Amino acid sequence: MGILTEGIPLGIKNFVTIFGATILWLLTIWIPYLNVGTTIAINTMPIALADNETPEGPTYIFKDKYRKYMGEYFVLMGLMYMAIWTASIFLIIPGIVISLAWSQALYLLFDKHLTPMDAMKESNEKTYGHKWTIFFTGLVFAIGFGIVACFILGIFMLIGVTFLTVIAVILLIALCMVGSVGINAVIYRKLCK
């Protein structure tokens, strides 16, 4: 569980940037062209954190450099999701295994400037022998966060204030991003740096 003990503090250390970027991303989710760039920026944030760099504030997600990689991003995501969905149709387990094998492909695409196919191949090689660790780290984080989220949302629902419940959901999504970005940065650093 070293990944959790390193990843969560890394996310907390960069809380303001990750939290602010996530809130900005949620606010721009309905703007198509802009949202693709901000989605790429949010998804590739662990690369900077893996290098022990701090993104220069939450507004970094609006930089043009993220929108210029839209083609590669869509090709990679299309290839990955087609294969993962196809594998999941037959059984859930193959879909999970393939998604774990390619979990580092997006980071490799943008960090090492590989082609989408090479990024998927490299990710498969880097995660070989580490899939259980990645799976259980994600599972433990999801269960732990789920328990905390259910407790907090339960309190707001008991109070009966719908507005506060909606605000709590948005804040919980952003807080989940803080932990998951830190965890993904540690996984990427250990496997690919």
Label each residue range with its predicted role.
Residues 53, 59-64:
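Membrane-helix interface linkers and caps
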Residues 26-55, 81-117, 121, 159-193:
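Selective recognition of hydrophobic, aromatic-rich stretches within alpha-helical transmembrane segments
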Residues 35, 148, 152:
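Short amphipathic alpha-helical segments
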Residues 1-27, 62-86, 98-149, 182-185, ...:
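Interfacial aromatic "cap" segments that immediately flank transmembrane helices
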Residues 151-159:
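Juxtamembrane "helix-exit" motif on the non-cytosolic side of transmembrane helices
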